[in-house]
């Protein structure tokens, strides 16, 4: 990732050097906190939005696009000013529905870092209908601004007029708001407990079927993923995708995976088979499944 980032940001530019130094200090995680953002803006006389626009090619460099070879970068800006990178993630030799779109990537990245509200979405290409619908599920969606290289300060609902969303199904819960499904993490295996805790934070008001993923890497690091459901159903993002996306955006190598656990309360639906199908194309490590 280090060399790819350096190729994306030519190092004969002082701003690019400063950005690379920040990323190097955090092992190439695609994230800048508010203090880092403000320091860069101050040192190089940039607005927050101009810095985000400058970072879009960098965000796109985290893409995996074996199918389309079309890299999309996104930056979700949290309500406190943190920058969460996102990029489209494609999975060859699996169903195209397994894909993670860049806006989904940035939002789920923010969610797994416990962000509660997105104020702005900055992206290098106009959001597709799938992503517009996904963003409409967010806590505070009515206040989100969309920024493109050719057009800034656009309300999300200008891209999705007469929108269908949670309110049409009498659902008050929104993605990024605090969730609790009263799942108890009392297993003797800590990795199973982490998958249960992730499931407990799922957003699944339509199926009430939470599931979570916990991935153990060979160095002892653990990445978890939660299920993000959508009022329109198809734009929903399974927990395996949110976990893999977080791994990609934080420079984890899938070849270093040691164990993968899924914990699921499958009341109306199950993601077990879908997860196993995708994993079979990525790793020889088998899914460990725990029914809740």
UniProtKB/Swiss-Prot annotation:
Co-factor binding comment: Binds 1 zinc ion.
Disulphide bridges, residue numbers: none
Record: residues binding substrate: 88-90
GO terms assigned for molecular function: cytidine deaminase activity; identical protein binding; zinc ion binding
Residues reported in the UniProt entry to bind Zn(2+): 101, 128, 131
Domain of life of the organism encoding this protein: Bacteria
Active site per the UniProt annotation: 103
Keywords: Hydrolase, Metal-binding, Zinc
Database matches in CDD domains: cytidine_deaminase
InterPro entries: APOBEC/CMP_deaminase_Zn-bd (IPR016192), CMP_dCMP_dom (IPR002125), Cyd/dCyd_deaminase_Zn-bd (IPR013171), Cyt/Deoxycyt_deaminase (IPR050202), Cyt_deam_dimer (IPR006263), Cytidine_deaminase-like (IPR016193), Cytidine_deaminase_bacteria (IPR020797)
Names of required cofactors: Zn(2+)
GO biological process, one term: cytidine deamination
Catalytic activity entry: cytidine + H2O + H(+) = uridine + NH4(+); 2'-deoxycytidine + H2O + H(+) = 2'-deoxyuridine + NH4(+)
EC number: 3.5.4.5
Coiled-coil residue windows: none
A GO CC annotation given for this chain: cytosol
Domain called CMP/dCMP-type deaminase: residue spans: 47-167, 186-292
NCBIfam families (alphabetical): cyt_deam_dimer, PRK09027.1
Family the UniProt entry places it in: Belongs to the cytidine and deoxycytidylate deaminase family.
Job description of the protein: This enzyme scavenges exogenous and endogenous cytidine and 2'-deoxycytidine for UMP synthesis.
Subunit field text: Homodimer.
Identification of the protein by name: Cytidine deaminase
Organism: Haemophilus influenzae (strain PittGG)
